[in-house]
Amino acid sequence: MISFIKGVLIEKDPTALLIDVNGIGYEVFVPMTTFYTLGDIDSQVSLYTHFVVREDAQQLYGFKSKVDKKVFQELIKVNGIGARTAIAILSGMDSKTLLHCIENKDYALLATVPGIGKKTAERLVVEIYDKLLKMANEIYAQTSGTTTTSQDSQAQQAPTSAVLANSIFNESVDALLALGYKQKDAEKMSRSAMGDATTAAEVIRKALQGSIRSKR
């Protein structure tokens, strides 16, 4: 069991990282809420991890905090919710927002996540309600807000060229597709979130937040 990983960030793409640990490269899948907190390539990274073994694959999932890891582990215990859907949930909302959804039985908001319909949302609330409430103190104790990465800080620099804008748009679409959104929806969400953003992380974050707000 691999429960924690610390190493050098070699590659950094939305939802997937490559981390060098003493010369061995580990592919780690992460929710966007963790991706936003990462530093630059070649920087040190430390993540709490959950190792999933299937017949056709072995995958490592990483999280910025032990609490997020625990929430992920509870999510994948719910019938009908696999690791990919759990990652999509924690990409569209942080643990605090998820707790609010569970407490308020906000099925409509949960159903905005790709792969979750109304019935699955209802089952999720029933199966995870007590467990998540027991974790409430841990969840609320987490530092609010998102750590600003060096990539985000670069957003105040030179205007985005057409080529860079296209690259950012495509990267955002690819990330949303990886989270389970349909091509048409991923393109629409990315286009609406572009604005004056100069990094794909900005666009993805705005796209996911916009999707949540539109359902409230």
From Swiss-Prot:
Region feature (Flexible linker): 144-163
GO terms (BP aspect): DNA recombination; DNA repair
Protein localization: Cytoplasm
Pfam family, one: HHH_5
Keyword check for Nucleotide-binding: no
Residue segments, region Domain I: 1-64
Region (Domain II): 65-143
Region Domain III, residue ranges: 164-216
Molecular function terms from GO: ATP binding; four-way junction DNA binding; four-way junction helicase activity
Any single Gene Ontology cellular-component annotation: Holliday junction helicase complex
Alphabetically ordered keywords of this record: Cytoplasm, DNA damage, DNA recombination, DNA repair, DNA-binding
InterPro entries the record matches: DNA_helicase_Holl-junc_RuvA_I, Hlx-hairpin-Hlx_DNA-bd_motif, NA-bd_OB-fold, RuvA, RuvA_2-like, RuvA_C, RuvA_C_sf
Role played: The RuvA-RuvB-RuvC complex processes Holliday junction (HJ) DNA during genetic recombination and DNA repair, while the RuvA-RuvB complex plays an important role in the rescue of blocked DNA replication forks via replication fork reversal (RFR). RuvA specifically binds to HJ cruciform DNA, conferring on it an open structure. The RuvB hexamer acts as an ATP-dependent pump, pulling dsDNA into and through the RuvAB complex. HJ branch migration allows RuvC to scan DNA until it finds its consensus sequence, where it cleaves and resolves the cruciform DNA.
NCBIfam families assigned: ruvA (TIGR00084)
UniProt record similarity statement: Belongs to the RuvA family.
Entry note about domains: Has three domains with a flexible linker between the domains II and III and assumes an 'L' shape. Domain III is highly mobile and contacts RuvB.
SUBUNIT field: Homotetramer. Forms an RuvA(8)-RuvB(12)-Holliday junction (HJ) complex. HJ DNA is sandwiched between 2 RuvA tetramers; dsDNA enters through RuvA and exits via RuvB. An RuvB hexamer assembles on each DNA strand where it exits the tetramer. Each RuvB hexamer is contacted by two RuvA subunits (via domain III) on 2 adjacent RuvB subunits; this complex drives branch migration. In the full resolvosome a probable DNA-RuvA(4)-RuvB(12)-RuvC(2) complex forms which resolves the HJ.
Listed name of the protein: Holliday junction branch migration complex subunit RuvA
Organism field: Francisella tularensis subsp. novicida (strain U112)
